[in-house]
Every structure is written in C-alpha cells, then in structure tokens.
C-alpha cells in the first residue's frame, strides 16, 4: 500500500498543476478576448466615421499582436512545465512497482493449453455479460470460437435489461420481475418488492398535491408487507400530511433523497443474483481484486527468498510460502488444516472423517496405516482405512 500512496502523491501534484494551469489559462484567454473585443470596437467606430487609421490605433494594434503572442508563448511554456511532472508519475510507478511478476507464479499458469485458454476466455465473457457489455462479449465469443449456450446468456440479458431500466428510473420491469418471483424472494427473506413499491410511492409524492389521490390509491400495494415493514409504511403515510406544504421542507425530506435509486439497483442485483444462482461479482473481478491484494505481498516474499538464497521454500505448487489475508469478503468456504501433518487440505489431499468422528487428511491416513489397519491418533479405536469418508465443507 505504501507504493500506491507514493504514486498517488505524485499524481495529486500533477492533478493540482493541471487544475491551476486550467484556471490560469481560462483567466488569460478571457482577458485577451476582452482586450481584443475593445480594440475591435474602436476599429469599427473609426471605420464608421470614415477616418483613416491613426498612429495611436496602429500602435495599439501592434501592442495587441504582441500581447497575443506573449500570452500564447507563456501558456505553452507553462504547459511544458507540466510535462516534467507527468514524467515524474511514470518514474514513481517504475520505482515503486516491479514490472516483472512472472517469478511469483508457476510456469503452468501461462501454459497455452486449449483447455486453460477456454477457461480464461469463459471467465472474461461471463464478466462482460455481468457488466452489461453484451456486444463485446458476443464479439469475443466469435473471435475465440467459444460456444456459449443461450441458457447461460439469458439470466445476464434479463438482469441487464432491468438494471438499464432502473438507471433510467423506470421501475416497471423490476416490479414485474419481483412479482413473478415473489415466492422465491420471500424464501430469501428479500425486501426487494417492498422497496420497489416504496420507491414508486415516493415518486408519486414528489409529484406534489396533484399526485396525492394517486399516491393514496397506490398505498394499497403495501398491504402484504404491513407486518414486516409497518414502521416504514407509517412514515410514508405520515408524509402525506406535508404534501401541500412541500416534502423538501418537512421532516420527511429524506424520502426524496436520490440515493434511493442507487440502493434499489444494489438490492436488485444482490437478490436477483442470489435467486438465479449467480455471484454478485464475477469470478474475474474477484480474482483480480484478490490478486491486487496478494501480489505486493508475494513480490516482497520473493525478494526476501532470493536475498537469503532459500528458493526451496517456495516450490510453486498448490500452496504459498505464507498466508495472505484477503479479508472476509473473499471467504467462500471453510478451510481445514490436518492436525497430524499440519498442512492445509486440498482437492488432491482432502479431509477424511474416521468412524470415530475424528478428521485427518488423506495423506495422514495413508501414513498411519499399519498392516492394513488404521489406529486413530486421538482415540484407541482401530478401523479399516476404507471406512473413512471424504468431507466436503
């Protein structure tokens, strides 16, 4: 993070110079335009009177040309000074970040096998669909000859259609979707449908007294949600008292906050993804975010390993030389460490539950077998190794 902070400081300096230069540029050009405008008015007045160009006006015109030239040269000179600041940002990036990252990953990651290429392409396509960049995703599918089923595309197409409508403050498609999936949303304890009805009611309130009767009529949609959202419904109904005076100057002015639209987009995305079995963030974006956290740590440990000449510590297999804390946001499943070998289990070495209930790794189980029998390391029970069952957390 220190490296990012160093680059950010240089970037802030450049942005401040750009801002100052822009303001100075604007002032200089406005003054120049005003000066030229005055001179033009004097010349027009002299032309109307039919008088020849006086020596004074000729001198003023020469001064005007010189002033324009000096101003342009000064602005160009100031602009050149900014170039050095921009180049310092590039130097700060080169100084604080190592561009050579191949040493922190296994060579197999860059293997050009067709299967791995398809997995990466599919991750990119899914990310593009989830971001609403449908045409780009289709173009990538055509160029990479990747076959994507319509069943895979359909949820993303529907999600993006509804989100586009919400961004345009059109609640119709979202309400229609929520009503058609009401039962499944209730199973998820989702309040999406209520929030959509509430936002529609607030839009009617924003219409003022002319929409009062329509708002009262629409309030009937709150009846199914009265038990769970009684307090919020009471607040909305109470706001009707201030409708003629203006909600923006009432205790209910918070109802008109524009942040409700951003909130409904987030709620819809989260609940719709849960209902459709999709992740809120694409696997590609999660992997990228995790990599941004892990890469600086891995670069540091790589430098330490090379400095101490103990390269055998990191053999580029399925585990890292140190644990990297990615935060709770990146926790998707539990992790089991074998209490015998003190190693984290993996797909090739999964956790095994013994008959007695104790859990060890498969590698530990194989090492404990003696004469075709297995004695639990934690209790006196002896058992057949084949009776062990794999556990999936």
Swiss-Prot record:
Sorted alphabetically, which InterPro entries does this protein's record hold? Answer: CRA_dom, CTLH/CRA, CTLH_C, Fyv10_fam, LisH, RMD5B_dRING, ZF_RING_GID, Znf-RING_euk
What are the UniProt keywords, alphabetically? Acetylation, Cytoplasm, Metal-binding, Transferase, Ubl conjugation pathway, Zinc, Zinc-finger
State the EC number(s): 2.3.2.27
| Reaction(s) catalysed by this chain's protein | S-ubiquitinyl-[E2 ubiquitin-conjugating enzyme]-L-cysteine + [acceptor protein]-L-lysine = [E2 ubiquitin-conjugating enzyme]-L-cysteine + N(6)-ubiquitinyl-[acceptor protein]-L-lysine
Q: Which CDD domains match?
A: dRING_RMD5B
Q: Which GO terms describe its biological process?
A: proteasome-mediated ubiquitin-dependent protein catabolic process
- GO MF, one annotated term: ubiquitin protein ligase activity
Instruction: Report domain CTLH positions.
Output: 155-212
LisH domain location: 116-148
Q: Where in the cell is it found?
A: Cytoplasm, Cytosol
In this UniProt entry, the residues modified to N-acetylmethionine are 1
Q: Where are the zinc fingers (RING-Gid-type)?
A: 338-379
Question: Per the record's keyword annotation, is Repeat included, yes or no?
Answer: no
GO CC, alphabetical: cytoplasm; cytosol; GID complex; nucleus
Q: Which residues form a coiled coil?
A: none
- Identify one Pfam family in the record: CTLH
Instruction: Summarize the subunit comment.
Output: Identified in the CTLH complex that contains GID4, RANBP9 and/or RANBP10, MKLN1, MAEA, RMND5A (or alternatively its paralog RMND5B), GID8, ARMC8, WDR26 and YPEL5. Within this complex, MAEA, RMND5A (or alternatively its paralog RMND5B), GID8, WDR26, and RANBP9 and/or RANBP10 form the catalytic core, while GID4, MKLN1, ARMC8 and YPEL5 have ancillary roles.
Function, in words: Core component of the CTLH E3 ubiquitin-protein ligase complex that selectively accepts ubiquitin from UBE2H and mediates ubiquitination and subsequent proteasomal degradation of the transcription factor HBP1. MAEA and RMND5A are both required for catalytic activity of the CTLH E3 ubiquitin-protein ligase complex. Catalytic activity of the complex is required for normal cell proliferation. The CTLH E3 ubiquitin-protein ligase complex is not required for the degradation of enzymes involved in gluconeogenesis, such as FBP1.
Report what the protein is called. E3 ubiquitin-protein transferase RMND5B
What's the encoding gene here? RMND5B
């Amino acid at each position: 993070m220190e490296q990012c902070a160093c680059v950010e400081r240089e970037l802030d300096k450049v942005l401040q110079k750009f801002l100052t230069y822009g303001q100075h540029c604007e002032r200089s050009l406005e003054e120049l335009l005003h000066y030229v405008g005055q001179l033009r008015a004097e010349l027009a007045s002299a032309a109307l009177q039919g008088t020849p160009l006086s020596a004074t006006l000729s001198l003023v015109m020469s001064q005007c040309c010189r002033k324009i030239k000096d101003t342009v040269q000064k602005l160009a000179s100031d602009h050149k000074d900014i170039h050095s600041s921009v180049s310092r940002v590039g130097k700060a990036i080169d100084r604080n970040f190592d561009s050579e990252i191949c040493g922190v990953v296994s060579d197999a990651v860059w293997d050009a096998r067709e299967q791995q290429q398809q997995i990466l392409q599919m991750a990119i396509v899914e990310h593009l669909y989830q971001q609403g960049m449908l045409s780009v995703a289709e173009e990538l599918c055509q160029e990479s000859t990747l076959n994507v089923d319509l069943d895979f595309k359909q949820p993303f197409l529907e999600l993006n259609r509804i989100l586009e409508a919400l961004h345009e403050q059109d609640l119709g498609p979202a309400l229609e979707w929520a009503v058609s999936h009401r039962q499944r949303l209730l199973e998820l304890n989702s309040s999406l449908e209520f929030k959509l009805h509430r936002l529609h009611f607030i839009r009617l309130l924003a219409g003022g007294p002319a929409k009062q009767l329509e708002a009262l009529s629409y309030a009937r949609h709150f009846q199914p949600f009265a038990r769970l959202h009684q307090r919020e419904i009471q607040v909305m109904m109470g706001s009707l008292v201030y409708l003629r005076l203006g909600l923006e100057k009432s205790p209910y002015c918070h109802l008109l906050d524009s942040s409700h639209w951003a909130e409904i987009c987030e709620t819809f995305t989260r609940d719709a993804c849960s209902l459709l079995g999709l992740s809120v963030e694409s696997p590609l974006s999660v992997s990228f975010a995790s990599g941004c956290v892990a890469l600086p740590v891995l670069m540091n440990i790589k430098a330490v390993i090379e400095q101490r000449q103990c390269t055998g510590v990191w053999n580029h297999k399925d585990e890292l030389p140190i644990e990297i804390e990615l935060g709770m946001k990146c926790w998707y499943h539990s992790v089991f460490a074998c209490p015998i070998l003190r190693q984290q289990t993996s797909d090739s070495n999964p956790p095994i539950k013994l008959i007695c209930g104790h859990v060890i790794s498969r590698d530990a189980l194989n090492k404990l077998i003696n004469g075709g029998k297995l004695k639990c390391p934690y209790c006196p029970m002896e058992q057949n190794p084949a009776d062990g069952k794999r556990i999936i957390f």
